[in-house]
Amino acid sequence: MNSLLMITACLFLIGTVWAKEGYLVNKSTGCKYGCLLLGKNEGCDKECKAKNQGGSYGYCYAFGCWCEGLPESTPTYPLPNKSCSKK
């Protein structure tokens, strides 16, 4: 029983350590989600935890929403072959 518990705990930690992180990106413009209040930011946290993003935590870093615990399928900035176009 203890072995099963240890294996489960290790798998959980591996998943947490290897989770993707990065700036949230707007797929249509290729730009980062912007923010002004650096550090703990309710807007960034909400965006990161949204169903379509799947992150575990978000905050404002260098005026962009940085997310942790993202699934590999969630795109992050910069997008390949797409530069930020502010139109």
UniProtKB/Swiss-Prot annotation:
Annotated ranges, domain LCN-type CS-alpha/beta: 20-85
Transmembrane segment boundaries? none
Record's CDD domains? neurotoxins_LC_scorpion
Is Zinc one of the keywords UniProt gives this record?
Answer: no
**InterPro entries, per database record:** LCN-type_CS_alpha_beta_dom, Scorpion_toxin-like, Scorpion_toxin-like_sf, Scorpion_toxinL, Scorpion_toxinL/defensin
The GO biological-process annotations, alphabetized, read as: defense response
Task: Check the UniProt entry and state the signal peptide residues, or none.
Answer: 1-19
Alphabetized, the UniProt keywords read:
Cleavage on pair of basic residues, Disulfide bond, Ion channel impairing toxin, Neurotoxin, Secreted, Signal, Toxin, Voltage-gated sodium channel impairing toxin
Tissue/organ expression: Expressed by the venom gland.
UniProt protein name: Beta-toxin Cn5
Originating organism? Centruroides noxius (Mexican scorpion)
